[in-house]
Curated annotation (Swiss-Prot):
InterPro entries: SPATA45 (IPR038806). The lineage of its organism: Eukaryota, Metazoa, Chordata, Craniata, Vertebrata. It comes from Mus musculus (Mouse). This is Spermatogenesis-associated protein 45. Belongs to the SPATA45 family.
Length: 97
């Protein structure tokens, strides 16, 4: 009799544990887009073309803008330096001019 009671107790504890795990898994926040929705076909395309599609916002680091450091970054661009070249002389609309 006692062995049957132990067997029943183990089964109920196992069932309680399983139920507890299921409840915990439902409550935890999942960052996985596949777990959130069943639109797996749509997400596959995003994963193929965009490598960070499944990256969480909590793990993302925003990079600060870095000043331009090219070879000509120190030169001030002036519009008058490269004037548009004219291929023809300006029109003279004067009659005898």
């Amino acid at each position: 009799m006692t062995s049957m009671n132990k067997g029943n107790e183990e089964k109920t504890q196992g069932a309680n544990r399983k139920q507890l795990l299921e409840e915990l898994n439902e409550k935890r926040e999942s960052y996985c887009l596949v777990e959130r929705s069943n639109e797996v076909n749509l997400l596959r395309v995003q994963k193929r073309h965009f490598s960070k599609a499944y990256q969480t916002l909590a793990c993302m680091h925003i990079k600060e803008s870095v000043p331009e450091s090219t070879r000509t970054s120190w030169v001030k661009h002036d519009l008058s330096v490269h004037k548009e070249k004219r291929h023809f002389l300006p029109k003279n609309n004067a009659i005898f001019g």
